[in-house]
Each structure stands twice: as C-alpha cells, then as structure tokens.
Regions:
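Oxidoreductase cofactor-interface core, primarily capturing Rossmann-like NAD(P)-dependent enzymes
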Residues: 1-24, 38-41, 45-50, 59-69, ...
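Short, conserved active-site loop motifs that form the nucleotide-linked donor/cofactor pocket
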Residues: 29-31, 117
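Cofactor-binding loops of NAD(P)H-dependent oxidoreductases
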Residues: 35
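Residues lining the SAM
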Residues: 56, 86, 254
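A hydrophobic C-terminal alpha-helical subdomain
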Residues: 211-287
Length: 287
C-alpha cells in the first residue's frame, strides 16, 4: 500500500471490518471499502474502476474456492485487467494439506479467466521467527517440527515490493508462477544462529514432533483447519518442498531481500516476549 501510494497510484482496500488497520490504510490515502469476499455483490461493487487487483484469502475452512470464483467473476465483469494471487509454495494437486490443495485449485480457476494472472508462492516468512518464539530470561528458543529441513525466509515487506511492482506493470508476468525466497537458505539451527547474533542473546533451535506441535496449536486456539494445514506443511518442509533459492525478489522489485539479522533488528521488541504460537515447556512435559 505504501509503495503504491508513494508512486501516486489510487488504491482501494477491501477489508472485512473497520478497525485500527483499516484506519491506517485510510491515513495512507487508500479508499477503504468494507465487505465480505463471500458476498458477490459487495465484491462486484468494489471492483468498479479497478485496473489491477491483489487477491489474498486467509487460511480458513471452506471459503477459498468460492471466494476465488466470486472474485474472478466480479473482476471479469468489471473489466479488471490483471490480478496478483497470493498462493503458497506447498500448493500442488497432491498436497495433503486441504488449504494447500485449495490454493492450487484456486490458481487453476484464475488461469481459466482472461485476466492477466500472476501467482505468488512464497516460502515461509521471516515473521514465523516471532510466531513460534519462546523467550526466557537468559535465552531464546525456536521450537518447531521441521527437523533438518531448509528454506530461505522471505520478509512480508519484500513480498509487498514484488506485488506492487507486478500490479503496476502486470503484462509480462501473465500466467507466471513465482516461487519467492529470501536472502539466504538456512536450516533452523542456522536461523537460530542469525537471531542470536542480532539479539546478543543465546538462541537455539529445538526440534519437536509434529503431533506435539499440533497439540500446542490447538491449545493456543488455532482452528482445526489451520492445525491440519500446518501439520502437513511440516511434513512438506521436512521433505524439501520449502527449500530452494532464486533472485526473483530482486529481479522483480529492484531490491535485495531482507536478511534474518536485518529482520530481527527491525522487530527487536517482538523478541522480548513469547510468540503467539510458542510451544510452552508445560506442553512438552505432558507430551
């Protein structure tokens, strides 16, 4: 949003509800429209006058495919030229995760339209480092079920730069599927070392079993749909689905992707407390 507004682009944001986040968008100069992606009339009204759209649906049960169909039809009727679709690196026909398979089908639905269409398949985000972070007085712990798998974590800001670049010049990206990676491929021991260097605090990676991870997610209030997705994604990660490197972020956006250290330094206060889905000691004791 910031990038598009700085470039002088008119931006309309379709939000589920008005809150502090939508007010922030308004402060940036965006036109904010409240609605539901399952409401065809609301989506259709929001598409009027739009030339390019970014489509992103949360990991939630039962809604992605219908929302994609409604979005595609509304965009086609309104004469939208291009769409950038947020998918995921685990999206494929044979995916065991319900969400990942639905993302693959959603890609195919959009490909059947006349819209200029680009699919983004990012690996895990740098923000995951906060998500599962366990903070103690004298150390930090990353407890995750990813064994010795590897990935090149990408920052949300870097993906935003890619999205903004494609939205402004979409034609050369038509029918492309872009796996997006960050600055450096690492295993979680390597990520822990980078976080330790940035914080000046001992940090270690503690691998856990997938059922323990799933139980912790459930205890933290995650939906069964999200638990199913992340449990199978953990298997995918171990199998190398999230691994790899390319330079697409720099080629498309013109900027090198953020490193782990740069991310940690820029979000240092978030490492002072446990992350939203931190696996607590008490759960490990009962596993």
């Amino acid at each position: 949003m910031k990038i598009l507004r700085a470039a002088g682009r008119r931006v309309r944001a379709f939000v589920h509800e008005r809150d502090a986040r939508s007010r922030y968008l308004e402060d940036l100069g965006a036109e904010v429209v409240e609605g539901d992606l399952q409401d065809f009339d609301a989506v259709s009204a929001a598409m009027v006058g739009v030339t390019a759209a970014y489509f992103c649906y949360p990991i939630a049960p039962g809604g992605l495919l219908q929302a994609t169909a409604l979005f595609a039809q509304a965009a086609s009727e309104a004469g939208v030229h291009a769409v950038v679709n947020m998918s995921q690196i685990s999206a494929r026909r044979e995916a065991a995760s319900n969400a990942a398979r639905q993302h693959w089908i959603a890609e195919r639905l959009l490909d059947r339209t006349a819209l200029i269409t680009t699919h983004l398949r990012p690996t895990f985000f740098l923000e995951w480092t906060n998500w599962a972070w366990v903070r103690r007085d004298t150390e930090g712990i990353l407890r995750l079920p990813f064994a010795d798998g590897r990935h090149a974590p990408i920052g949300g800001r870097d993906q935003a730069k890619v999205i903004a670049a494609i939205l402004q010049n979409p034609d050369s990206h038509d029918r492309q599927i872009y796996p997006l990676f960050g600055a450096e491929e690492l295993d979680y021991n390597g990520i822990a070392d980078k976080v330790q260097h940035a914080l000046g605090l001992p940090v270690r990676y503690e691998p856990i079993d997938i059922p323990v991870f799933a139980a912790s997610l459930t205890a933290r209030g995650a939906t069964p749909f999200l638990v199913q997705h992340l449990s199978h994604v953990a298997h995918d990660y171990r199998d190398g689905i999230f691994a790899g490197m390319n330079n697409l972020v720099e080629v498309i956006s013109g900027s090198k992707p953020m490193t782990v250290e740069e991310y940690v330094i820029s979000t240092r206060s978030k490492f002072d407390t446990n992350g939203r889905y931190a696996v607590e000691d008490v759960l490990l004791a009962t596993a």
